[in-house]
């Protein structure tokens, strides 16, 4: 028997108190003057547990600025040719400061992914992130990432909290017959998943495109350092993937290869952005 369980990521974040020298600056600027705007990009604050989906791999923060409703990136980083800012997230957050024109409205888009071995490329000219699935492996937290578009009307010197969220559904597979399968001669050491997922995300609109069957390449199964399977009951963690999905709830078929006599396919699996779906049961011996 297999079961599907859809549950939310912990996405609540405590309000941040931003203190800096900006607190003492005069906010009474006239329209057309420059204001100092400090953005604090924040991943969900209940993370940081050093397990899958802890957010700790998403340290590479990129951000770009546009006039509100426009798609041409602005060179606001002190160099006429530079249209993307970069910074390193520390303890799930990072504050960055921009000089923006008082009285004008801006869209600022943020993207945080892994510093190394990330399969994602951000193009500020299109406001899109693309996925290179040749770099996507099963059971890899380097595929975790977060985004947010923040629209702001500058009214002088100010601070803005920006709460980033995942554009993915996390799909986990676990079994309670791992030891029984091993005793019968089937020892599962690697797993692979094939499922439909998108390859492009528009950071300004949240829309996705280029859906196809994607292979999350065979890799070693999760270990204790990756955390326990999200469902209680002694389930062995066999597989974890991040699927780029649309904003609406959907269903996908998940093909699961574990090196057994035949692959398993789980049909009509519910997936939703920023939620996790857990597939679990006696999956290795109950075929």
Task: Give the predicted meaning of each segment.
Residues 2-11, 17-287:
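Sec-type signal peptide cleavage vicinity
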């Amino acid at each position: 028997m297999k079961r599907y369980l859809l549950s939310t990521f912990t996405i609540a974040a405590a309000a941040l108190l931003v203190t800096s020298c900006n607190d003492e600056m005069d906010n009474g600027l006239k329209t057309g003057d420059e204001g100092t705007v400090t953005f604090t990009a924040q991943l969900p604050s209940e993370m940081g547990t050093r397990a899958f989906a802890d957010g700790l791999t998403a340290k590479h923060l990129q951000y770009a600025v546009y006039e509100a409703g426009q798609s041409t990136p602005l060179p606001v980083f002190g160099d006429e040719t530079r249209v993307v800012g970069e910074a390193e997230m520390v303890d799930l957050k990072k504050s960055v400061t921009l000089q923006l024109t008082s009285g004008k409205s801006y869209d600022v888009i943020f993207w945080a992914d892994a510093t190394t071995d990330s399969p994602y490329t951000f193009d500020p000219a299109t406001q899109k992130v693309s996925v290179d699935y040749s770099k996507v492996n099963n059971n890899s937290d380097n595929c975790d990432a977060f985004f947010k578009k923040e629209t702001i009307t500058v009214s002088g010197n100010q601070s803005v909290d920006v709460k980033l969220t995942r554009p993915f559904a996390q799909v986990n597979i676990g079994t309670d017959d791992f030891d029984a399968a091993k005793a019968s001669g089937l020892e599962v050491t690697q797993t692979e998943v094939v499922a439909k997922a998108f390859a492009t995300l528009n950071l300004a609109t949240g829309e996705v495109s280029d859906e196809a069957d994607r292979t999350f390449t065979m890799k070693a199964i999760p270990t204790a350092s990756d955390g326990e399977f999200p469902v209680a009951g002694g389930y062995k963690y066999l597989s974890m993937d991040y699927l780029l999905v649309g904003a609406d709830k959907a269903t996908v078929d998940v093909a699961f290869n574990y090196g057994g006599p035949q692959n398993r396919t789980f049909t009509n699996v519910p997936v939703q952005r920023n939620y996790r779906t857990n597939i679990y049961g006696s999956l290795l011996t109950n075929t």
